[in-house]
Amino acid sequence: MAPRRVKRANVYDLYRTCKQAGTCPPDVIPKVEGKTIADKILQYGSMGVYLGGLGIGTGSGKPGTGGYIPLRGGGSTTSLSSKPFAGGIPLETLEGIGAFRPGIVEDAGPALEGILPDAPAVVTPEAVPVDEGLSGLDISRELSQEQILSFLHPEGPDDIAVLEVRPTEHDQAHLLSTSTHPNPLFQGPVQQARIIAETSGAENVFVGGSGIGSNAGEDIELTLFAEPRTSTPEVPIKRSRGIFNWFSRRYYTQVPVEDPDEIAAAGSYVFENPVYDSKAFKPAQQPDITLQDEASVTGRDAARLLAGPSGRIGWSRITRPTSLGTRSGVRVGPLYHLRSSFSTIHSPETIELIPTVLEDDTEVLTGVPERDTGFDDVDLDSIASDSPLLPERHHLAFGARRSHIPIVARPGVQTGTVIDTRQMAENSVYVSDNGGQESQQTPTVVINGNINVSMEYFRHYYLHPSLLGRKRKRLFG
């Protein structure tokens, strides 16, 4: 792979850093100091050829000691494009009224004269010069060292009509043109769709899809630190501290109570000591204390429904058993926090549901216990069975009919020739007796007719019951 080309810094930046160290490349110093071959050619050529202020040479482009000689007189001329505008009020209608003209610029002398009281306010020209036609409006400004302005004092009636005078012809109306160049990167061309449902010319551009290449970031799934206890969690209440915290073991003795009625009747029990019991002493009747509103009793006497540190909710109440007391009502003794927690509501058990609908491509597996079924595995590709056959009696029959030929065993009859023909009787037996001597001939059985011997193989097999197709069982209807 070719080495990657690293872009070099700017020539002027290199010149600032490497000039003092003397480590500049050979092409940096001549380019900055103007000592290249092209600069030298211009320097030597400018000695004999004057190029003026064109800025071609390496000079500053300033004029010589004598300066430049202007081709025109002093001042400047500005030309504006215009076109004739027809309209306005004809000058013939202003003969009796007069015309309002601006002040006349005159060279009256070195001093500036003030407003003359005898000067007329309106000057009526004898003849208005009419321009025969100009292609443009020429505005010239003459520069002079001293300019004197003369102002006219108005005279005559106060009601003077001031009209805008416009010649009938050859009026100059200036035009201002503005050109706007839209940026195609931010503003698409407006096109009309010629085909139905064509959206290629729409201005709305939707950019979608996935990015190409590797992403610089990493997708990390957010994890909740604590799940809400309710569907609409509220702002957690700040737990009280010190003596206001009923669950504090420093200020209260925690007493778990199983019966909530004991919390309601806390403080109403009176214990009598039989040693100091007296008939004259009658205990004061205690009022029935029930669960009341917290606003009607003090903060300690009211039973509250609080959530403990473990999160369980229960009834809580602060009580003080009978102890020492003063006449001012101050009682001395420990404080007990009676607490009766409710039973915990466990989350329901998760029961795996069985799908009621089976798709067509769902594979149903049926478990079959492994046991001996009494069937033998038969190889379907084998010609003969490997199982031993039981001996059975069979007979061989030829021909179209089935004829049984019984063989009668008689004593003294030796091996002979048995001939059976289709023209003879079925039960006829012919025996040739050779006198009791053994015959050297092989017994021959002759059967009339054409015998066609053919070899045919037949395969008879039965499928194992486990290979038979089973109907799919459905759980519901």
From Swiss-Prot:
Recorded GO MF terms: DNA binding; structural molecule activity
GO cellular component, one term: host cell endosome
Motif (Nuclear localization signal): 1-9, 469-476
Disulfide bridge map: 18-24
Record key words, sorted: Capsid protein, Cytoplasmic inwards viral transport, Disulfide bond, DNA-binding, Host endosome, Host Golgi apparatus, Host nucleus, Host-virus interaction, Late protein, Microtubular inwards viral transport, Phosphoprotein, Viral penetration into host nucleus, Virion, Virus entry into host cell
Entry's Gene Ontology BP terms: microtubule-dependent intracellular transport of viral material towards nucleus; symbiont entry into host cell; viral penetration into host nucleus
Domain of life from the UniProt record: Viruses
Modification after translation (UniProt): Highly phosphorylated.
Chief location category: virion
InterPro entries: Late_L2
Subcellular location: Virion; Host nucleus; Host early endosome; Host Golgi apparatus
Pfam families: Late_protein_L2 (PF00513)
Family the entry assigns: Belongs to the papillomaviridae L2 protein family.
Function: Minor protein of the capsid that localizes along the inner surface of the virion, within the central cavities beneath the L1 pentamers. Plays a role in capsid stabilization through interaction with the major capsid protein L1. Once the virion enters the host cell, L2 escorts the genomic DNA into the nucleus by promoting escape from the endosomal compartments and traffic through the host Golgi network.
Oligomeric and partner information: Interacts with major capsid protein L1. Interacts with E2; this interaction inhibits E2 transcriptional activity but not the DNA replication function E2. Interacts with host GADD45GIP1. Interacts with host HSPA8; this interaction is required for L2 nuclear translocation. Interacts with host importins KPNB2 and KPNB3. Forms a complex with importin alpha2-beta1 heterodimers via interaction with the importin alpha2 adapter. Interacts with host DYNLT1; this interaction is essential for virus intracellular transport during entry.
Protein name: Minor capsid protein L2
Species name: European elk papillomavirus (EEPV)
Lineage: Viruses, Monodnaviria, Shotokuvirae, Cossaviricota, Papovaviricetes
